[in-house]
């Protein structure tokens, strides 16, 4: 389990699974307090690399399940040679592009600002289409099984 939030609870320790808590705010500027950094990205990559091969499911969450976790999930999908379309084309998610970009870059995936902008446009179009079809605004938590 990867948790990207400033809100932690002692109850999390009751869960006897491998977990990484990354203490970050949901901000998309490196200038803001609590922003995701390359050090955070290295922590996540190290955590993923150290998982035993028998681990087949990965739960990624944040406070509300739509931004930091989806940015992380999209990057991890690319890292595992999968498409990240399921994240960017989902109108219920607004992936945190700082989390996504820094994770990709730290892993060695060529992720230019233009490539990130293209994905943000795809996500924005998905939301506008859902709104037009009166299918936006529903809340859905993110869970990715890898």
Predicted regions span which residues?
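Helix-loop module immediately N-terminal to the HCX5R catalytic loop
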Residues: 20-59, 92-93
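Lipid deacylating catalytic domains
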Residues: 12-16, 39-40, 117-121
